[in-house]
Amino acid sequence: MAVVTTADNLNAQVVAVFPDKVRIVVDKLEDFKIAEESLRVGSYVRIADNENAVLIAIIENFQIVARDDGTRHHIIEAFPLGVLRDGKFERGGDSLAIPPKNVEPATIDDIRRIYSDSVSEAQGFCFSSLASNPEVRVPVNGNKFFNKHIAIVGSTGSGKSHTLATIVQKAVSEKAGDFTLNNSHVIVFDIHSEYKSAFPNANFIDVSNLTLPYWMLNSEELEEFFLDTEANDHNQRNVFKGAIIQDRRAKFQGDESERQRIHLDSPLFFDIQAVLDTAKSRNEDMIDTGETYQSGAKKGQSKLTQGSLFGKLTNFVNRLESKVNDRRLDFFLGERSKTITFEQTLESLIGYTATNKSNVTIIDLSGVPFEVLSITVSLISRLLFEYGYIYKRLRCANNPNEKVNNDVPILLVYEEAHKYVPNSELSKYRSSKVSIERIAKEGRKYGVTLLLASQRPSEISETIFSQCSNFIAMRLTNPVDQGYVKKLLPDSLGTLIDKMTSLRQGEALLVGESIVLPSIVQIDRCNPAPSSNDIPYWELWKEEWRDMDIEAIKAEWYR
């Protein structure tokens, strides 16, 4: 039971108050507990005054001090979280009267009230419990959580994939009425083929059924995909751009005035084979000099001279021809990519397919060749951002007084985000960085937000990572990553940040605009789980030798 500290029976008292710390002296620590639970670092205390206000603080550290008479007392330092006043919790502790009169461990009801009062039931979204007391659920404000960008960081084995799966599973299962599907739309970029098992009803896309229209690439993406961007060859650029515009205009069926306005970024079809044929022709171009041979075997024939680009486009032609003939790129350059419409592409990405309407779309990128990974992510991300932009424009045009810009908002989830948007200026990452940085800066206005998950946050583009307003920081062991995350989090977190190195699997520091106060939480287990379990090397190695079908591996490799 709680020990009531009175003037006659003073077991604990406040001896110092600082802006970010309260120092408490406890005479008998064994009596300073509640419900027979001993205090520990991370436990909560309540400090009362005569104004019916109760300061709630979390214990950060303690010391044992020996007195001259041989007895000992304990000095506890606690970080003030906020004040309970009239049964309601308020952030901040500067309204407490000095000196406080009463110190005791906080009750479970005190702790629950901190979190339960922070958000209404309609806006609450809960996926974790307090790590120090699993009976206390820790909700976040669902609107502030999802309409601001989110970051999940943690070393391998910290529970990052399970946390991501838990959040998405709970988001798509919440319903405000009696219907089958809620209105959530989540697109997961799955680079390691982990999440299909966690979302068995998802709209699943991999290289076997992924079709992206290459002709919808913008100018930067086209250059990165087809040109040797490091070579800085103006000839190949000019021929490439000119051939695309020429073929688009040739295939355009509209007015001549509209035809002349077609440019490299026009979202109109062009035939990549026609571009290749043009490049070959220019590379072999011979020009008539206007003279004829007067004698010999060529008598009467026109004299020809090599064109200005003769032989200068050989590398470009070979590169382009190699891509067109590369079967691994059929999802981008195959026959289907020439006939798929914009509507079909968008429907498949946001779960509106005729055969399977789904809240979650998983884009399995494990089979996408690394050299086109950035382009693939860039095109999909840009299309989804532009969907949000156009949808808002149409919605506001039809409803001038509408306050909700987008009533079908989407969440883009980037697993291992440092592989798409690294903190690097290399040209091979330029397209994906440009697309995702634009979403990070402007996406919220159009109902398109990000969830970035990474084990190496220090390698993510700082422009993108700094836009996140909600952080789920799990165990981080790399000092560089620890320092990077600490730099982005508020200084007022005190020792909570230092605990990142010792968090157990599934534990996380939850901080951001959506939660009433930074907290160490235990993330709920997802069900079903992603296939991210470690391979049991030692158990497998001890089993009997297994034969492998090398021919089957070769066939799949060469497919």
Q: Where does each model-flagged region fall?
A:
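Conserved AAA+ ATPase small/helical "lid" subdomain
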Residues: 237-264, 498-528
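Conserved P-loop NTPase motor module
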Residues: 505-559
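Conserved ATP-driven motor cores of ASCE-family P-loop NTPases powering translocation/secretion/packaging/pilus
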Residues: 228, 437-522
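P-loop NTPase motor domains
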Residues: 193-199, 203, 224-435
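Basic- and hydrophobic-enriched, low-structure N-terminal and domain-boundary segments
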Residues: 1-154, 162, 406-408, 424
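Glycine-rich phosphate-binding loop of nucleotide-binding enzymes
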Residues: 124-212, 462, 510, 541
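Hydrophobic residues in beta-strands of the RecA-like P-loop NTPase core, especially within AAA+ ATPase
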Residues: 189, 414, 453-454
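P-loop NTPase nucleotide-binding module
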Residues: 155-175, 378-390, 433-434, 439
